[in-house]
Amino acid sequence: MLGMSLREAAAALRLGQIKPTELCQKCLSFIKETSFLNAYITVTEDFALKQAAEADERFIQGKPLGDLDGIPIAIKDNFSTAGIETTCASRMLKGYIAPYNATVVQKLFDQGAVFMGKTNLDEFAMGSGSTDSIFGPVKNPWSYSRSYIDKTSLSHHAAKDDSDWVITGGSSGGSACAVSAGTCYLAIGSDTGGSTRNPASHCGVVGLKPTYGLVSRHGLIPLVNSMDVPGIVTRCVDDAATVLGVLAGHDPYDSTTIQDPFQPFSLPEKVDVRNVCIGIPKEYHAPGLSAEILSLWSETADLLENAGAKVVEVSLPHTPYSIVCYHVLCTAEVASNMARFDGLEYGHRSDIDDSTEALYAATRREGFNEVVRGRILSGNYFLLKRNYEKYFVKAQKVRRLIADDFVKVFNSGVHVLLTPTTLGDAAPYLEFIQEDNRTRSAQEDVFTQCANMAGLPAVTVPAALSSRGLPLGLQFIGRAFCEQQLLTIAKWFEKQIDFSPLQFNRDSENGNIVQQYSKSASSV
């Protein structure tokens, strides 16, 4: 039951094969069994059971609220949830309880979704490994899979080193982990430069970043206002389309959302790609791209071409400048957004209050980790009067050129772009943290941040297992507000691949998940 897709679970609920409370209890039990993964910051057990009991009554009366009624979900802990702690995985907001629900959260609740808890992340979503949370790093569930154990010749009698488990990617690593492990059927993440797609790729699930403005950001604690988008993590493309239909549309609380009504859509069961033109950006042959990803990318292009699609090489000439441009704009907006955390209104407040300036400085020093403080410093540097035109304004101009590159390609007749999602499979934790956050983020975001810069929809789909038995994903980038076309092509690819979901390595005697990595890497 826990391995089903969202739509399969919804069908089982409608047919009475299982009750919402039974499904909720199964998920809660599995959350406890897999707690070593550290996917959740807060588990809302009582709240979930109450919601599930209410769903039971609706199903008895034959009046379910929608496709998500009774479906267990999880929310990244940078979305506001009324009455439930929202921490952003930071000391700055530890203990903070928002007075309202984010719009996406409220829309899910209005559909009857059952809220299992808040998922772990890099502090304030600044990272690409889910390793910089005050609640400890998130462990990739594939570290405990049969495929990884077999490929790396590990057994539960050996390899008791933390370096043997691999990262989830980030910053929405908890959300991707929760869906991949089977503790919920849907998780909401945020995506500023790839923060939903990156961990989805590393965890072998589907990660959708909608077009900027299609889904409300109200209640998402901002990182970069001009790029932040709520992301959707599911087990299959059809599920992502279902959830998008619930979340998309205008929100009076978010002036950047579209004004026109959004029409939910279902993807066709049979997809024909013979009239589709797929673009392969030549600039995405980036340094560090693994041979496995390169081969997979090429094989997928051939697969599409053999099915009748037109596959053409295209150029996005300003791509080489994109990651640097992204860094300037990202840190500048971070510096602005983080200014609100001053110890006066909400969040952490230092005891050092000899003066207002001393309070500000101590609060931010105690509340933010080094990564956040470093990005604030970088952003403030770019925003200095003497640097503003040279860095920030120039980066804005380059961003426009990057967006124009995509417009030209799509206007040439290309429907969707096919690219890698990441440079390779997930790195071991101890290897990942050897390099600083900034370097790692630049490496991990190289293929994903362009879609955020241009405001385009993009989805990553699991495609294969690496030689180490870990998931590899490929990314499809579509035209603005053309999610239906994008997801239809992604579904076709998904059906051709038929990717096998995670199978935990279990003890043959007691059936428990084998945890060969016995030492805890978490510290709060």
Swiss-Prot record:
Active site at 76, 171, 195
Domain of life assignment: Eukaryota
**Subcellular locations according to the entry:** Mitochondrion
Q: What SUPFAM superfamilies would the database entry show?
A: Amidase signature (AS) enzymes
Q: Which GO terms describe its molecular function?
A: ATP binding; glutaminyl-tRNA synthase (glutamine-hydrolyzing) activity
Using the record, list the residue span of the signal peptide; answer none if the entry has no such feature.
none
UniProt keyword Protein biosynthesis present: yes
Q: Decide whether keyword Isomerase is in the record.
A: no
Write out the catalysed reaction.
Answer: L-glutamyl-tRNA(Gln) + L-glutamine + ATP + H2O = L-glutaminyl-tRNA(Gln) + L-glutamate + ADP + phosphate + H(+)
Reported EC number(s) for this entry are 6.3.5.7
Q: Which UniProt keywords apply?
A: ATP-binding, Ligase, Mitochondrion, Nucleotide-binding, Protein biosynthesis
Question: Would you tell me the Gene Ontology cellular component terms?
Answer: glutamyl-tRNA(Gln) amidotransferase complex; mitochondrion
What Pfam families would the database entry show? Answer: Amidase
A single GO BP term for this record reads: mitochondrial translation
Q: Tell me the function of this protein.
A: Allows the formation of correctly charged Gln-tRNA(Gln) through the transamidation of misacylated Glu-tRNA(Gln) in the mitochondria. The reaction takes place in the presence of glutamine and ATP through an activated gamma-phospho-Glu-tRNA(Gln).
Assembly and binders: Subunit of the heterotrimeric GatCAB amidotransferase (AdT) complex, composed of A (qrsl1), B (gatb) and C (gatc) subunits.
Q: Which family does it belong to?
A: Belongs to the amidase family. GatA subfamily.
What is the designated name of this protein?
Glutamyl-tRNA(Gln) amidotransferase subunit A, mitochondrial
- What organism does this protein naturally occur in? Xenopus tropicalis (Western clawed frog)
Question: Its encoding gene is what?
Answer: qrsl1
